[in-house]
Amino acid sequence: KMQSTQAMRAIAEHSDKTYTLLYTKHTALKIGMFALERMVQVMEMTQAGMVYADHYQQIDGVQKTAPVIDYQPGSLRDDFNFGSGLLFNANAFKEVIENTEEEYQYAGLYDLRLKISQKSKLVHINEYLYTEVESDKRKSGEKQFDYVDPKNRQVQIEMEQACTNHLKEIGGYLYPIFRPVDFSSHTFEYEASVIIPVRNRIRTVKDAVRSALNQQTTFPFNVIVIDNHSTDGTSEVLRELSSDKRLIHVIPERNDLGIGGCWNIGIHHEKCGKFAVQLDSDDVYKDEHSLQIIIDTFYKQKCAMVIGTYMMTNFDMQEIAPGIIDHKEWTPDNGRNNALRINGLGAPRAFYTPILREIKVPNTSYGEDYALGLKISHDYQIGRIYDVIYLCRRWEGNSDAALPVEKINQNNLYKDRLRTWELEQRILQQETTLEKIQQSIERLFQKQTLSWELAKENYQALKQYRSRTKEISKWFGKQYLDANLFLNPKRILSTTAQTDTASIHSRPCFLCQTNRPQEQEFISYRNYQILVNPYPIFKHHFTIVDKEHKSQSIAGRFKDMIEFTDIMREYFLLYNGPECGASAPDHAHFQACSKEESMQGSYYDHIDLIDNDKVRISYEDFPYSFIRIQAKNKKTMSKTFHLIYDIL
């Protein structure tokens, strides 16, 4: 497969020049005059990892311009349009491939360009440098749903994996930890409001409004229509429908509002309900139960936003391709990360009004819904409904049925910018969070060793014991041992703890939060709690415990252990297995110790087993036996560890 990692490896192996040109189509390519020289020139001027260019497309014998857009950090869509001619810096290409351990069938090229973008620029040359033959003649409104086509599911799984790995590498990944939503924080006259922005939709608005008013619910609701100065008779239709007092017809005083601005008028209306629910003026709800299902989902899934499933129909509401759009690629844990890769989140959308009022809707007529999804999912869980509750009507009057390339580029540029802003916030937030956690850890240690009597006494005692350290030197055969020894009687409880199954079952777990001393405070980090160890061996000694009672096992936790070396940079991490003397083999935990205690510089007799550019593995056999792994990056370290772990 052209897009596979295997294909990328083959290209790297056969590339023996400074630059590598990749053509991604199977049709004829016509290179423009001095086009390759121009691409090389820009590559050298910018030191880019890859350059791409505007071009021409030949469709049914007719040549058309095909401009593309600049690449941004948020240009994470796997279908980002670079055109078919990509010129790579061969060294950058090879370096990425040499360090790539994943094997993708479909996401190889996508993974490659993400990894190149981590170290080098991807530069757009806004000059027309070649002509390609375009065989995909579908309209833009048809192409946009390719990623939700069930036959492409395996492709999307790989693309999500590659994107998620990229986000983790650059600090843009969000772990599945969400802020709770308090639905009792505000009071409302109405439980829900259906929000319908409209301008000049005389053919469809009556269907939309009646669909909303016909909803059967157990709660009071209304319909707020923001009529954005219609001139085709839409306003008159709405006035006729206003005999139903549940319909609120609003004509804004402002004349500079897009769809997002109309939404702001609706959600800030004094009669707006607790939940604001979307209904476009072209569309209708599937039946009279849709609104009830949406509101029930808020309470069941405890979320700040709900997105449903819709079916594409023609004007007469008969199903048309691509049919049902359910966005089953969304997962509760990784949905908000994968949202940076895809171009839409689904419909209909509904929001908890207090949060939406706080965020406010961007005053645009494209992408405002996607912007809200990114913003809300940054902090809150998004709920999903996978049954069809909404009919999206496609007809010649739709604003997005068949767009010219300039409009497509404008839309994609805006969504890429939304993703870039979100990504920049995530990276900055993570850097700030790490700094705050590091400061909090130091404050926790100072506070606990001053105010918690047990910790205070034992750390003071440790200083006294260490002041009586004894040095011993002795030959063991041909090996000479230098050691420092000190007594530490405060650790007697840990070293003599009974760790057999019967003893463990007969005692409460002392690492579980409910069983720990009230004085023992902690810092939460994802699914762990960082505690000051009250029975220290080291000058600064922490225990990092799982929030849940889970058995001590390094399997599946080694990546966490590596991550804590970033969070606690002044410490080294220890893991003591259940069969290696751990006093709490029934509760997963690590130890963190200040680096002045480290064993760096000590002599070990070792044998190198593997030593290459990526990893060094050696066997150390004096004064005790262990395997040392030194790796170029975290991914290689983790993979190497698990290979050895599985063998042992």
Where are these regions (language model features)?
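A recurrent flexible, glycine/aromatic-enriched loop bordering the glycosyltransferase active site
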Residues: K64-F88, E329-A350
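A conserved acidic beta->alpha catalytic loop
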Residues: A28, D227-E236, N255
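Short beta-strand-to-loop acidic/aromatic patch adjacent to the donor-nucleotide binding site
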Residues: D16-K30, G273-V284
